[in-house]
C-alpha cells in the first residue's frame, strides 16, 4: 500500500511529543527496511546553510528523507567497532607495569584535573573555546551505506508510484548515506524543480580544512562554474550561543549573518568586505538573564510577573528570588532606618523629571522584595503603615506613582488615615504595585539615558499597551504584564547597542521604536486570544560599516559558505555550495572527520597558528545538477 502524507505527518507529531525516556514511535517504512520522513528542506544539514533555499527552485519546500529506522540497522559493524575500541581501552590495565598513574611507590595517587583556568592558560593568543559547557544537538539520521543508497535512489526513481501516494510522489527525495573514505557522500538527492526540470544533488564531505582540501574545492568550482563566476559568500557569527542549562531551559541566541559577493578568485574563509550586509538575529528565549545588562531588572521583572500570576491564580505560591535568603531581623532594621530617614526629609517640591534619588515606595520595594515569604512582607508593611498613621513619614510619593501605597502616603498628609487590613492577597497586590512602579521608572530611565529614546513617548507606549490588554486581567495586572514587552525591548536594543559603532548610535531610537512596536503588538494580539507571549525575536539588516566588527568578528564564524552557479543563457545548469562548519549537525560526519583531524597543543613557545585553528572546520561540498528538458 503506498505511503501517504498523513502517515508521515502523524509520525512527526509522535516524535515531537515523545519524552526523553519514552520509546520511539514505530517508523513509516519503505520496503520494510528504510525509514521515510517528510521534513522541511531548511532542516537538512549543510543544505540549510544555503543563503536562500528558494533559489534552488525545488518542487516543494518539504522533502522526503530516507534512512535506516535505527542506528546500526543492516550492519553489525557498529557493534563490532565499539567492542574493539573497548578492548583497546582495557588492554593496558591487564599489565600492572603499564599503569604509571601512581608514580610514587607507597605514596598517594597522583592525579591532574583539567580546569577552565588551565584550558584558557593553554590557549595562547586569541583562541576561543568552542562548545565548552555545551551539548551538541545532532540531526536525527541513521545513514545507509553509500552503495545501497545509490541502488535505492535508482529504485525509487523507477518505482516511485508503487510506494508513494500522489501527494508525496512529487516531493524531492534526500537519502542519508555514509562511506568510510574521503570524499564521503552523506546526502544523495533527486527530484524536480518547480518548472518540472529534473535535478540530482550530492553532498560530499572532504574532511577537515587544509591546503589540499582548499585546492580541491577551488579546482572543482572552476570546473563546474568557470573561473569568472560570481562568488556569493556568507559568514555566520554566534554572539550569544543557544546553550541550555538547568537554570536556563529555554535559552536565547544572537547571530550575525554576513553576506557579500565578489567576482574575484575564490578564497576559502574569506573575510567580509565593507560592502557586506549584516543581518542581526536576536532571540531572547525565555528567562535567559544573559541578555539583561542589569541582573536586578531581570530578577525584578519575573518576580513582578510571578506576583501578578498569584493574584490571578491565588492557589499558586509566591517565589521570592533572593538567594541566599535575607535575615528578617536585618530587614526590620532596614525598614526602621527608612522610617527614621523619611521623618527628616520632605520631597514635596521635587519634580518628577528631576527626581533621581528614588521614590519612597522604591525604597520600601527594595526592602520587602528581599523577604522569604508573604508573612514577612505583611509585617514590614504594617511597620511602615503604622509610621504613616503616627505621622512619622514626611516624604512624598511622585505624582505619577499610581500604586496604592503611594495613595496612602498622600492621604496620610491631608486627612484622617486608617491602616488598611492586610491579608495575603492584599499584601501581594500592594507589593506588586510598588514593584511595577519601581521597575517602570528604572526601565524608562535606561531607555532615555543610554538609548536616547524619549521618555514621554515610552510612557505613552506603556500606557497604550496597558489600556489595550484585555480588561479581564485587572488594572494593575495589566500594568505588570505591559512591562514584559517593554523590558524585553530594552534587552534587545541593548544588544544592538553593543554591536554598533559608537558614531552610529544615532540610529538606535528608530530601531528601538521598531522593536517596541513589534513586541507590544504581539503581546496584545496573543493576550486577546488568551495566550501568553513568550517569544521575543527581532531581526534587522545593517551595512557592515555601521557595525563594531572588531567585536563580533574577533570570533571565528561558526558557518562559512560560498555559493556559485553555472548558467547557459537563462537556464541554470549547476549550483555549488561550499560549506565550512565548526560543528556539523550530523553525528557520523563528526566522528569520521575527527578521526582524521590533526591534534595540536598551543604553548607560550609555540602559539596556535591560523592553519591549526582552520583545521577545526569541516569542509563540505554540495552540487546540484539541473538536467535540461530534451
UniProtKB/Swiss-Prot annotation:
- Gene3D superfamilies for this protein: 1.10.287.1880, 1.20.58.730
Cellular compartments per GO CC: cell cortex; kinetochore; RZZ complex; spindle
Knockout consequence?
Answer: RNAi-mediated knockdown results in embryonic lethality. RNAi-mediated knockdown results in defective chromosome segregation, premature spindle pole separation and incorrectly attached kinetochores. In addition, knl-1 localization to the spindle-associated rod-shaped structures but not to kinetochores is lost during anaphase of meiosis I. RNAi-mediated knockdown also results in abolished targeting of the spindly-like protein spdl-1 to the kinetochore.
Q: What superkingdom does the record give?
A: Eukaryota
Check the record and name the PANTHER family matching this protein: PROTEIN ZWILCH HOMOLOG (PTHR15995:SF1)
Subunit relationships: Component of the RZZ complex composed of rod-1, czw-1 and zwl-1. Interacts with the spindly-like protein spdl-1. Interacts with NDC80 complex component ndc-80.
Please give the name of this protein. Protein zwilch homolog
